[in-house]
Amino acid sequence: MILSSLLPLSLVTLTSAALTYRGADISSLLIEEDSGVAYKNLNGETQAFELILANNGVNSIRQRIWVNPSDGSYNLEYNLELAKRVQDAGMSVYLDLHLSDTWADPGDQATPSGWSTTDIDTLAWQVYNYTLDVCNTFAENNVAVEIVSIGNEIRNGLLHPLGSTDHYDNIARLLHSGAWGVKDSSLSTTPKILFHLDNGWDWDAQKYFYDTVLATGTLLSTDFDLIGVSYYPFYNADATLSSLKTSLTNLKSNYGKNVLVVETDWPVQCSSPEYAFPSDLSSIPFSADGQETFLGRLADTLEDVGGVGIYYWEPGWVDNAGLGSSCEDNLMVDWRDRTVRESISVFGDL
């Protein structure tokens, strides 16, 4: 402690918080608050969750946007309200466009209601106009946007059936259209455009997608800036940090893009995991301390390959503690009393 206090401030800064984006996805926040959830900081004081995160080193927030959800959840209006709070808390905004009315993931990529499922020309224009409108709406409300993801976990395509992997030429066109909707918007600073696949540890899957979609000639390397991946260690024993490092290294070198992990979690309770955990993570406990250890090692992996960020997925979704996994609790908030766990402070060290 004494020695660190004698170091020049510039050196202290360089030895911590090396990642550009130390983030979290808190898309569910407004829904949680509407249900009566109030969060407590490490001192046990009630505080807005975005402020708790900002005060503990988070500098960027990821938000999922659905096109026309039946109950309004995660629509444009919802996300604009959340983004204003994020910006007021001093954090950047990362918009995750699902391009669907509901969850988009490797198993579900449903085209929004009212969008074409039969004509690719029409659908491409709808994607362009939608992304343009989203970005212009944020611009009109003086909310800056740092990153926009065109689609979510699109390894199996997007906007099915036209954008399925039976039609990589269509996938390329849809991604190109979405990218240019962002580029043509009135945002004063053009957001970085990101494409996002699941199973970030699986280099073969990543390579096949990008090689195939870029080979069409419709999607250009200049259309996007970042490659994002999901990295969930509890879904596959092959999801080792070593495999992730290889995949991220290759993604960056092959395609010339900065890489980041845009979804990840670690459990505090996982009594009966459906799948074995990866061998190089098996020593990490299921606990708040384990969350800190895992994220620290993940950050080290990102830094080793020149990666730029990590986003923890839904650390405060207390009504969904398992976050879709076979583990009982992956949160950084105690779902019983809504107090954040000590692991929340790890972001300042990433």
Swiss-Prot record:
Origin superkingdom: Eukaryota
Signal peptide from the UniProt entry: 1-17
EC numbers: 3.2.1.89
Pfam families xref list: Glyco_hydro_53
Keywords: Carbohydrate metabolism, Cell wall biogenesis/degradation, Glycoprotein, Glycosidase, Hydrolase, Polysaccharide degradation, Secreted, Signal
Reactions catalysed: The enzyme specifically hydrolyzes (1->4)-beta-D-galactosidic linkages in type I arabinogalactans
InterPro entries reported for this sequence: Glyco_hydro_53, Glycoside_hydrolase_SF
Compartment(s): Secreted
Glycosylation sites (chain numbering): 129
Noted pH dependence of activity: Optimum pH is 5.0.
Gene Ontology MF term list: arabinogalactan endo-1,4-beta-galactosidase activity; glucosidase activity
A GO-annotated cellular component: extracellular region
Active-site positions on this chain: 153 (proton donor), 263 (nucleophile)
One of the protein's GO biological processes: pectin catabolic process
Main location: secreted
Family: Belongs to the glycosyl hydrolase 53 family.
Annotated function: Endogalactanase involved in the degradation of plant cell wall polysaccharides, and more particularly of hairy regions of pectin.
Cited PANTHER family: ARABINOGALACTAN ENDO-BETA-1,4-GALACTANASE A (PTHR34983:SF1)
Protein known as: Arabinogalactan endo-beta-1,4-galactanase A
Native species: Emericella nidulans (strain FGSC A4 / ATCC 38163 / CBS 112.46 / NRRL 194 / M139)
Gene: galA
